[in-house]
Amino acid sequence: MSRKTTVRHFEENLSELDTLVTQLESNQLSLEEALKAFEKGVKLSQECQSVLTQAEQKVQILLEKQDGEHLETFDPELNS
């Protein structure tokens, strides 16, 4: 999958995830519909997380190549 396709796919998944959250928060779905929406949301969330993880790894590799030094894994909790 090309970079543009991956970014487009990520953006589409994120948009769909946002729509699902809005639907779930509206409390207008039946239990069955809510469970299906939740299940789909979990899947989309996992796909988005996978793309973000891959992007983070690419950035680390590029920075290592540029600086020629070993980088520590980014920990968002330490940097907040």
From Swiss-Prot:
<keyword id="KW-0540">Nuclease</keyword>
<keyword id="KW-0378">Hydrolase</keyword>
<keyword id="KW-0269">Exonuclease</keyword>
<comment type="similarity">
    <text>Belongs to the XseB family.</text>
</comment>
<dbReference type="GO" id="GO:0005829">
    <property type="term" value="C:cytosol"/>
</dbReference>
<dbReference type="Pfam" id="PF02609">
    <property type="entry name" value="Exonuc_VII_S"/>
</dbReference>
<dbReference type="InterPro" id="IPR003761">
    <property type="entry name" value="Exonuc_VII_S"/>
</dbReference>
<dbReference type="GO" id="GO:0006308">
    <property type="term" value="P:DNA catabolic process"/>
</dbReference>
<dbReference type="InterPro" id="IPR037004">
    <property type="entry name" value="Exonuc_VII_ssu_sf"/>
</dbReference>
<dbReference type="GO" id="GO:0009318">
    <property type="term" value="C:exodeoxyribonuclease VII complex"/>
</dbReference>
<comment type="function">
    <text>Bidirectionally degrades single-stranded DNA into large acid-insoluble oligonucleotides, which are then degraded further into small acid-soluble oligonucleotides.</text>
</comment>
<dbReference type="GO" id="GO:0008855">
    <property type="term" value="F:exodeoxyribonuclease VII activity"/>
</dbReference>
<keyword id="KW-0963">Cytoplasm</keyword>
<comment type="subunit">
    <text>Heterooligomer composed of large and small subunits.</text>
</comment>
<protein>
    <recommendedName>
        <fullName>Exodeoxyribonuclease 7 small subunit</fullName>
        <ecNumber>3.1.11.6</ecNumber>
    </recommendedName>
</protein>
